[in-house]
């Protein structure tokens, strides 16, 4: 299972909010990420480039429950 918990921590450290992601991607994509639903790697790439962070700062892989 993919978790976006690292992204929310990264945003807090950067002094940003989820709504700031709307400038990078759509509100629908942010909503999907809030529910840990899959998004494209292109979206992850755009977030990483915009925030100046690595993939590990955006997603983590967790074992299925």
List PLM regions with ranges.
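Alpha-helical residues within the helix-turn-helix
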Residues: 12, 23, 49
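Short alpha-helical DNA-recognition segment
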Residues: 15-31
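Residue-level detection of the helix-turn-helix DNA-binding "recognition helix"
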Residues: 12, 26, 35, 63
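Residues within the helices of the helix-turn-helix
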Residues: 8, 19, 31, 45, ...
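A short, Lys/Arg-rich alpha-helix, primarily the initiator
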Residues: 1-20
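Short, contiguous strand/loop micro-motifs
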Residues: 4-5, 30-34
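Short C-terminal boundary/hinge segments that cap the last helix of small helical domains
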Residues: 52-65
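Short, basic-rich loop-to-helix N-cap that marks the start of a DNA-contacting helix
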Residues: 36-49
């Amino acid at each position: 299972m993919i978790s976006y918990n690292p992204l929310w921590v990264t945003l807090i450290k950067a002094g940003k909010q989820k709504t700031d992601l709307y400038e990078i991607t759509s509100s629908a994509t942010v909503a999907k990420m809030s529910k840990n639903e899959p998004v494209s790697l292109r979206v992850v790439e755009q977030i990483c480039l915009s925030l100046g962070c690595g993939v590990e700062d955006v997603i983590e892989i967790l074992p299925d429950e």
